[in-house]
Amino acid sequence: AILLPALARAREAARRASCANNLKQLGIIYKMYANESKGEKWPRNHGVQPWRPATAASLGCLNAHNGSQFGPDMVALYPDYLTDSNVLVCPSWNNYDMPPAIGVGVIEDDGSGTCPWVGFISQPGDCYHYLGYAFDRCDEGEPTVPHPYNPAVQVPSQVATTLMLPENATAMAVFLNLSTDPADNAALDQDLVAAAGDGNGGSQTIYRLREGIERFLITDINNPAGSAMAQSQLAVSWDMISSNWENYSTFNHVPGGSNVLYMDGHVEFLRYPHERFPVTRSWAEFWGNMPAQ
């Protein structure tokens, strides 16, 4: 009995390391994609896919899930860059024992031989979040605002205010699964309009992730000697983190914390609560109070 806690910690340490390796592989995949994409852009958000459940079922498809997902665009990545759905599943995830086909929504044929999307991954954002944008002002100490869906909690202004601006309405509709039109995905491939001071480097623009974007991310706009943020400081994907277990899994890892992939490809484990985005109380509140997809 004395050994059980130690064994549990050892198992979790191994799962955490495997989880970090998955994120590192995703970092390589994103870099490979960017090297071949127009403007060296990283993949956009998953968005609205053509396999809406009703349509997919009528064409003989199984496991075609609804929801835009806070993950990368699977049509762009599969199968040329991402070939193994297990890379998207953290071993510490509370649904890890679920078959991968169900857990991340790997589309299968129902036996009719008519499904056109066999093998595609319909819900890539269940374990690791990926937004496709550069958020550089979400650390603790940066400006916060009341959550648009729960004014009782404070969340990062750069994210919350930006998503609620009318100029970003189409992107917001896709993020919140309010759109059923795949044509709206074009909004996710554009930069977002931000309120004054909320944009990257204090501008009015939230840029899509692309190689070289760090040059636009000034660490301190009030300091004439302020330098650009390095890729090693820009978080691009991370373990699930939420303040609300009823809507979403709170953490993949116990004790609470997240593996975080940075744009240069390295991964760090940050224990919650941390002062650095995304393992902050304000970000956990933002995600935990979003409408469940």
Predicted ranges, named:
Residues 1-162:
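Hydrophobic alpha-helical segments and their capping/adjacent flexible loops
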